[in-house]
Amino acid sequence: MLSFIFLVFAVIHFGIWLWGWKLWAETGRPVALLVVLIGSTLLFYDNLRIGMGRFIGEGDLLYALSVPAFAWHWSLLPLLVIAAGSVARLAGLPWAQHKLVMGAFCVVAVVLSAIDIPKIFAMELHLACLDDTVRYTTTVREAQLCSPTDQVISSNDFPIVAILTNVIVLGVGIALWIQRRWAWLAVGSGLMFVAAGALGQGRYALPISNLGEICITLGFIVTCAHYARLKQRSAGNVPQPIGAPTGAIEKGRA
């Protein structure tokens, strides 16, 4: 059953990703949305390899399929920091219009990438099982042991990059909520924060966290497309509807 849930997550992520590219083309190809889409390219793949693990089984093939998922996560996750700064700029937030501010977002992203990228070259994955799922991962809890002879694999590696990235995106989302009355990014990143934090410590931490990734990705895509459309309208070039609600949460406009 859990494998099926991850396969559903994979389909949802792929659908969201394709929809995002459609919105990107329709709304003037905003840089903010481009960065989000590049950063989220392999979210569907990460869920797919977990969902398919039970069918592939333990071995070199599943291990090899797992490596790109971790390499992608460690190298491209900080792109969301740049996306957060870009969407703040796109939304017309005064403090985000300064080049130094956008430069600061980029510097933070580079620093965070520099923290995580070395992990790619020291990657060591271990077999883990949960319900009917079979996957390779960096740490293995007692509840994820595949056999009585397997050992718990712990790590002192604190996910500082993921936490700081989420906090920065949430901060921009809250700023948009307060200054522009647009809550989608705050809600999406807030759900991601809760899913990976308060709800991400139990037996089913992984599927809950991956559900949070759907929320933050949706929040980013809808927000980027919304403000790109407003920018086109202000320039007198009104695009076709993007298929996302524009008034349910937002009561004002940029």
Regions found by a protein language model. Give the residues of each.
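Hydrophobic transmembrane alpha-helical segments in integral membrane proteins
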Residues: 1-16
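C-terminal transmembrane-bundle signature of multipass membrane proteins
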Residues: 77, 167-253
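Aromatic-anchored segments of alpha-helical transmembrane domains
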Residues: 41-48, 108-118, 189-202
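Non-cytosolic membrane-interface motifs at loop->transmembrane helix junctions
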Residues: 59-71, 132, 205-215
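Internal transmembrane alpha-helix with an interfacial aromatic "cap," most often the third helix
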Residues: 14-24, 41, 49-61, 71-105, ...
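Membrane-interfacial loop-to-transmembrane alpha-helix junctions, especially the N-terminal start
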Residues: 27-40, 96-104, 178-189
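Membrane-interface interhelical loops and short amphipathic "cap" helices
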Residues: 51-67, 126-140
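Membrane-proximal helix-loop-helix units in multi-pass membrane proteins
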Residues: 85-166
